[in-house]
Amino acid sequence: MIRYLLAIAVAVCSLVSLAQAQAPDPQNTLVIELKTGKVLIKLRPDVAPKHVERVKLLTKQGFYNGLKFHRVIDGFMAQTGDPQGTGAGGSSLPDLKAEFKISPAFKRGSVGAARQGNPYRDTANSQFFICYDGCRPLTGEYTLWGEVIEGMEHVDKIARGEPPRNPDTMLKVYLLADAKK
């Protein structure tokens, strides 16, 4: 009987530890509200600290609220973050250099910094993309700063096109830590 109770206690403690380990860090979880639901993105300051800092700053300023997904390529990625909605705009902040010290492979749900095509890879600003599939060749070419941890099914429903005929928008973007404020 004691062994049975001990086994149950160990199992309960393990489940609690597992749940705590998998709970998102509110300070490093970005929430994007789309018309179909919420997308949660785990920010990766361990991989791209300057890009994560920029995304947090712009998010807290409300910069991303209402911006369109202006370039959405089926089977590849959905791009947003341009206030002009053309792919040529950005915030008033200086551009960022690429961060490749640690470069995880891009995969479905990876979030990376969009930039102008140039050999210096130093023109990332406010734009970003969320990968569908086929993004592996971007590894080491674009800065990965996040991973979708919930709601990828909503990203899958974003209108396709370059630009889409009726583009979807990010209704509201905030950090999970600020959700109840």
Please give the residue ranges for each predicted region.
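Cyclophilin-like peptidyl-prolyl cis-trans isomerases
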Residues: 2, 14-181
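Bacterial N-terminal signal peptides that target proteins for export
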Residues: 1-8
